[in-house]
UniProtKB/Swiss-Prot annotation:
Motif (Q motif): 97-125
Family annotation (SMART domains): DBP10CT, DEXDc, HELICc
Catalysed reaction, written as an equation: ATP + H2O = ADP + phosphate + H(+)
Binding site for ATP: 141-148
UniProt KW rRNA processing keyword: yes
Protein name: ATP-dependent RNA helicase DBP10
Length: 932
């Protein structure tokens, strides 16, 4: 049997499990989470009573292998898999490096196969075996590498089933609401077929509903730190039963201001827990990770963090001041060739907006006061290996004000746009992301902070509206395209102030900046050298950072278009003013470029060639025009208007002519020296340029960048703080060969705890020193415009007070830190009293009545209709409703069938009854004792 025809254990198990499961189970899960736009693989249709067959030599379509091209030797992964296969008897027959080799249970392998996963990604191959060995792991891999499954699969395998004892067993903390929702969806899908109870706790949801969820005794909690701490303090939760805690996107957890919440939560966790930290980057804030209580952590780091895909092509467009908007419109329309929205698409988009806003869902029936809900067919998400749309593009902007500005501009230009920023409402986030993922909109405008955790598998293009201040942020941005072997483009708009950051990126990536003048000079040298055999070299947009400007004629056309849009839309001009102010604050807080790059950028700007027409647009048609203008500047006759047509005596007697003659004599030496200086600088520049190009030609390097530049962190320092995963496996293999010891029962005479303490107390090898080598910081644009003092009217005090005043009541938490006292408001106690619930104690056995199916109470009461009114248009319609209700057994107030006693009295009967009552009162009533 060849390698291509290997027996797929996971797929076989999945097929065996799917035959025995009814279709209703699959559909019920989809209905339960149909409003969560987080997964790509839920559009697989299951047909009952039909077995699926895998063709030989043809693999089933799987989730894209986003990391298979990483610099990871095959023998290393095989050694790692073989080691853990040897220790797990259930996985000895499984193929090395596959999911069954990790020792997963049958139900988990079935769920993995249903999700479409066939082979684990590199981060999963390295971390899952270590997590199964109960080691604390720090995992570093880029976005989209499968980090979520790397910690979710071991979680489900370890917990296996619901525990009858009260207490949370696993906690997953995410920095954003949408990321928490995505992780919760993954946990639900991988734990399908078990009785594990999982809930999600995010801000913006009802506290009462979350109280109900917590009372179901969940095993797994996926939450954001702020809301989880709120519930912990409000409900006085004990976390002594926690076995497994995950900090997802750990760098953002600390950078977004969750340090206070995390320190409070960490203090309440037991020391025997297993802690996992997963992130796309290693920022400066990792010094706080040492406080998280990791014990002898293992660092799993992939080399792809400082690299970009080989299929990614990049173009950098130089612009002048106030041309950024016009350049963006040109890139979208002429480079990406994104079509404008058709009337049908606009109508479809508006219908979806109305549906999501609830204008149609809340149409009220006038008669029975019940809400009528229109049924609609929810669009399916495309598979993970397909583009949401042909021209799907994500645009990165610096602040949320730019998101509003660019979104308004593109909508006015005729595009359908989705947008996401940090403070956007949770429902609006889901709605905007869903519209982009189903292809309703082709553009998504986001900030760097909001883009973290957004689950978009494949994109066609990435546009950097502004060049980021960090090279690693650039890699994070462009890493969202050119995945899974697909090609992609990244377009960046660069002005003079951002040129130093481009030069920093040149050094970071090891790819040289290529100007149009450099390419032309290279072509001239090759033409001279090769003569008749000359072939113009192709420009590599993957190995070079090609910089140039957009054609001047085209940019002027789009500049006029932008000015017309701005002139005709007042709202756009208002939003532009806000974005301009936000941009100033952003530039003020952005980290500066290196001094060497600043110096080099000034040299490039002085040459005047940095904004030549980009090589992407072919030959420069404006060059002939420029040559003609240059000839006019170099004409022999350089007379001014004062000397023109002045001849003979008139020329000699004119005072202005004499003045210009003297002026030329004075300026001539200065002009001569300036000309000599320019020629000398040009010779020096061309000498260096020619030397570099000649070296490339002689060495046949082509478009290769810097080969000697290294950007990796110091491995010696990292080894002092972490154990390397590969070395750990190799060490275990050697010990297994040479030693007779059984690792499960042998007690060593060494004291590893003391060694760990010595390493932690060492000043030269600390976690903070290691983390400082690889930094990646995102500026939180939400806090840029937060003034230190904002005066607000206090109605109780009757005067203005500081809105950000620290005059608040605090309570001391378990960590000794002060936390807001508003967390403990007594709402849970009131909620519990209303339902007569008894207090539960962590560790005790749960009550049998505890319901963990996450199903809400549904009202099934049928109300009787109102009586028909003869003076209304719907009299006959309402009469039929009343008749049907009476026939079904309902009692309609005031309605009697023919022959029954009339319960309602007429106005004449009421009048007669009142007259009889008055007569009786006059006859029998006693006189009043009150004084008149």
């Amino acid at each position: 049997m060849s390698d291509e025809e290997d027996y797929d254990i996971a797929g076989t198990l999945a097929l065996a499990g799917s035959d025995s499961e009814p279709e209703s189970d699959l559909n019920s899960d989809n209905e339960e989470v149909q409003d969560e736009i987080v997964s790509d693989e839920d559009d697989t249709k299951h047909k009952p009573n039909k077995k699926q067959k895998l063709e030989k030599g043809k693999s089933k379509q799987t989730f894209p292998s986003l990391e298979l091209s990483d610099d990871e030797a095959e023998n290393e992964s095989k050694d790692m898999a073989s080691y853990f296969v040897a220790n797990n008897p259930q996985a000895k027959k499984a193929k090395n490096g596959s999911f069954p080799s990790f020792g997963f249970s049958k139900f988990l392998l079935t769920n993995i196969s249903k999700k479409g996963f066939k082979q684990p990604t590199p981060i999963q191959r390295k971390t899952i075996p270590l997590i199964m060995e109960n080691r604390d792991v720090v995992g570093m891999a880029r976005t989209g590498s499968g980090k979520t499954a790397a910690f979710t699969l071991p979680l489900v395998e370890k917990l296996k089933s619901h525990s009858p004892r009260v207490g949370v067993r696993a906690i997953i903390l995410s920095p954003s609401r949408e990321l928490a929702s995505q992780t919760f969806k993954q946990v639900k899908e991988f734990s399908k077929g078990t009785d594990l109870r999982s809930i999600v706790l995010i801000g913006g949801d009802s506290l009462e509903e979350q109280f109900s969820s917590m009372m179901t005794n969940p095993d797994v909690i996926v939450a954001t730190p702020g809301r989880f701490l709120h519930l912990k303090v409000e409900m006085e939760l004990e976390l002594k039963t926690v076995e497994y805690i995950v900090f997802d996107e750990a760098d953002r957890l600390f950078e977004m201001g969750f340090a206070e919440q995390l320190n409070e939560l960490i203090a309440a966790l037991p020391s025997s827990r297993q802690s996992l930290l997963f992130s796309a980057t290693l920022p400066r804030s990792l010094i706080d990770f040492a406080k998280a209580g990791l014990t002898n952590p293992v660092l799993v780091r992939l080399d792809a963090e400082t690299k970009i895909s080989d299929q990614l092509q990049m173009a950098f467009f130089s612009i002048k001041n106030n041309e950024r908007e016009a350049s963006l419109l040109y890139v979208l329309q002429e480079v990406i060739k994104l079509p404008l929205a058709s009337p049908e698409e606009v109508k479809r988009y508006s219908d979806m907006e109305k549906r999501d806003n609830g204008s149609e869902d809340e149409a009220e029936d006038e008669n029975n006061n019940k809400k009528k809900r229109f049924k609609f067919k929810k669009e399916r998400l495309p598979p993970a290996n397909m583009l949401p749309s042909k021209h799907s593009t994500i645009i990165f902007v610096p602040t949320k004000h730019h998101v509003e500005y660019v979104t308004t501009l593109l909508k006015d230009a005729g595009y359908l746009v989705s947008y996401i920023y940090g403070t956007l409402d949770q429902h609006a986030r889901k709605q905007q992301l869903y519209q982009f993922r189903i292809g309703m909109t082709s553009l998504l405008v986001v900030t760097d902070v909001a883009a973290r955790g957004i689950d978009i598998p494949i994109l066609a293009n990435v546009v950097n509206y502004t060049l980021p201040g960090s090279s690693k942020i650039f890699i994070h941005r462009v890493g969202r395209t050119a995945r899974a072997g697909n090609s992609g483009w990244a377009y960046s708009i660069v002005n003079e102030k951002e040129l130093p950051y481009l030069l920093d990126l040149e050094l970071f990536l090891g790819r040289k900046v290529l100007l149009t003048s450099m390419h032309e000079k290279k072509c001239e040298m090759l033409k001279t050298k090769q003569s008749s055999n000359y072939v113009e070299p192709k420009v590599s947009y993957t190995d070079r950072l090609v910089l140039g400007s957009i054609p001047r004629v085209d940019i002027e056309t789009f500049q006029e278009l932008y000015e017309n849009i701005l002139r005709n839309h007042y709202e756009l001009s208002v939003v532009k003013g806000v974005a301009t102010k936000g941009e100033k604050l952003y530039y003020r807080t952005r980290q500066s470029a290196s001094q060497e790059s600043l110096k080099r950028s000034k040299e490039i700007l002085s040459t005047g060639n940095w904004d030549d027409q980009h090589l992407l647009f072919g030959p420069n048609l404006e060059k002939e025009k420029e040559k003609f203008l240059t000839q006019l500047l170099n004409r022999k006759s350089k007379e001014t208007v004062f000397e023109f047509n002045k001849k003979g005596n008139d020329r000699d007697e004119d005072s202005l002519v004499e003045f210009m003659h003297k002026r030329r004599k004075q300026i001539a030496p200065i002009q001569r020296r300036a000309k000599e200086k320019r020629e000398l600088l040009e010779k020096e520049r061309m000498a260096g340029l020619t030397h570099g190009i000649e070296n490339e030609i002689l060495k046949n390097d082509g478009e290769i960048g810097y080969s000697g530049i290294t950007i990796e962190a110091d491995e010696e320092e990292l080894q002092d703080a972490f154990e390397d995963a590969d070395e750990l496996i190799e060490k275990k293999k050697i010990e297994k060969k040479k030693s007779f010891r059984d690792p499960q029962y042998f007690l060593s005479h060494y004291a590893p705890a003391a060694v760990i303490q010595d390493q932690q107390l060492s000043l030269s090898s600390s976690f903070a020193n290691d983390a400082a080598k690889a930094t990646f910081d995102l500026d939180n644009d939400e806090k840029l415009n937060a003034n230190k003092q904002v005066m607000q009217w206090d109605r109780k005090k009757g005067n203005y007070v500081n809105a950000h005043s620290t005059d608040k009541k605090f309570i001391i938490g378990e960590s000794g830190q002060k936390i807001p006292a508003t967390y403990r408001s007594g709402r849970f106690d009131d909620w519990k009293k209303q339902r007569n619930l008894k207090p539960t104690k962590t560790g005790a056995m749960e009550a049998n009545a505890t319901n963990g199916n996450d199903r809400r109470f549904k009202h099934k009461k049928v109300a009787s209709p109102k009586l028909p009114d003869k003076f209304r248009d719907d009299y006959h319609k309402q009469k039929e409703k009343v008749k049907k209700a009476v026939d079904s057994g309902l009692k309609v107030k005031g309605y009697n069938k023919p022959g029954q006693k009339q319960e309602l009295r007429s106005t004449e009967d009421i009048r007669k009854a009142r007259e009889a009552k008055d007569k009786k009162k006059q006859k029998n009533a006693r006189p009043s004792r009150k004084r008149k």
